[in-house]
Every structure is written in structure tokens, then in C-alpha cells.
């Protein structure tokens, strides 16, 4: 697979070499307008998470539209450095950074732009304070609260209060608030998503209230992600929603958020049609990243992408679909999970 594939501007989509990740700008811009429009007239604002698309030009389009707080969120230090070099002035690294080398890089970055960082334990807070003090910079800190994700975050209770008090008193750190992420829908079952999400969001808000009762201000309550925006708008105390998937969208969330449409799709070529009931595409595991779910074949009724090896994608065909995909034809695949699929491409 050739990555990146360079084609002159104006090349018809059908003439692109494959596999290729293709972005429909009209659909993407419409997704941005629809999603961020929900925040335009509210005190709660969106903070775009750029980890899914990793593209400064797309992030600019997001910040140029209504409804954001003017900042972005990233998941890795490398992402933060790329977007800082692209001129972004408010970056939240919504993850923990613990190694000495990365803390040095983080502090160097804070000398260039305003950087926020997640913390969920006092030892890490002390590390960050020492690094920031040595570098002569200030790091914005958000205490990460565990709210159902089962990964990073300190549980609601005395530990969270003590951590906030510690951060609030450490040199080189500015306690900006708290953050948390809540789980998305369970597969295709959305029946309990509303209640579960509201409960999980309330855990984060209760952490804010508990910390404030101890005498420490919590001006920012940042929650994530795209799937929880409508519930977050109902919860007093939330100040921002970190959301990443909405500009490009994927099949995983499409049924749950029908107001948004997939803007990024994979163009593949049929390289073989060895038997009536099967066609073979040149988009395999390396092009589609089907780890969390198989991409969906678009526009071919009776056809479905069923299995993938490194460089081959197998499409099962039934009925009239057996006549539709012959060697040399093109096919469209909608990624099931956006971030992993986009990560396969250089652009």
C-alpha cells in the first residue's frame, strides 16, 4: 500500500489510487456546524479533540465555527507538540504524563503555548511541579476523575479532595479544574445509555462540589466525548465537552447520532472476483484497522465486508450483488472506528 498517495488537486475521486482515505469536506463542515451549534448559545462549550483526525487544518475549521471555547484537546505529548507548532494557543493534554523526559518536553511546550495536563495521583503532581518550577513555567492542571471508563482517574472521595488541595498548593501548577470521560453506548444497545451517562456525569460534578466544599475552587469541569454531548448539556456544573469523532464520524456512532454523517471513507479497488459469492478488495487490515469492528461496505445491497488479512479485504456477495463488483471496480468502506482507521494513513 502506497502511503501517502500523492495526486494533483482536481483529480476525480474515482481515479485515486487505492486504498485511499477520502474526506468529503461538505459533509465534514455540516457535521461541525450541527454539533457545535448545540453549544453556540449555552454556557457549556465544546473543546474539539483532534486525536481522531490529527489534522491542524481540520482543527482550524472547528475553531472557526461557533460553539467552542477556543481550545483543543489531544491525547499524546507528540500531538500537543505538532499542534503547538501549528499555532494553537490553548491545548489540553487529556492524559497523564509521568516519565522524566516527557515532563521536560511538556514544560518546554508550556514555554511556547498554554498547556493543560491531566493528573490523577499526588506523586505525579509533585513530578510536574518540580519540572515546571525548574523550567520556569506554569502548567494548567485538571484532576482526572474516574467516571466509569475503568482506566485513568481518581475515584470520587477523600483522595480526590486531597489531590486537589495538594495541586492547589504546589508551585508551577495552576489547578484549573477537573475532567472525566464517560463510556459510550454498549454495542448497538442504546436503551440505558441516557441514564448511565447522566449518572456518570453526575459523579464528575459531585467531585467538583466535594472539592469546592473543602475550600478549593474548581472553575472548569471538562467531560468527554462526542456520545455524551446531549446529556452533558443537561447537567449543571459542566463547563466543556471534549469531543473528537463528530467532524469525520464513523459507523460505530452513526446509528446513535443520526444527525451526523460519515465524512471520511476508504476507497478500495476490487482486485479479484474469483467466485460469484465473493470479491476481494485491496483494502485489508492495514488500510481499515478492523480491530474494534469491521468497516461497512457502502452502496452495495447484498454485499458485506466480512474478513480482512494484512492487505486483502473479503466481501461476501448475495443475489444481484454478485454481478456488481468485478476486478477493477471501486468500492467504498465506512470505517467502524474512526481513530484507528485514520491512523493508518499519512496526510
Residue ranges and their predicted role:
Residues 28, 51, 83, 143, ...:
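Conserved, mostly hydrophobic/aromatic
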Residues 4-8, 27-58, 75:
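N-terminal glycine-rich anion-binding loops that anchor highly charged ligand groups
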Residues 274-347:
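C-terminal accessory subdomain/extension
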Residues 49-186:
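Active-site-proximal beta-alpha core segment in soluble small-molecule metabolic enzymes
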Residues 227-301:
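Active-site loop ensemble at the mouth of alpha/beta enzyme cores that anchors a bound cofactor
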Residues 4-23:
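Generic N-terminal amphipathic, Lys/Arg-enriched alpha-helix
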Residues 140, 146-258:
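Active-site loop/helix belt of alpha/beta enzymes
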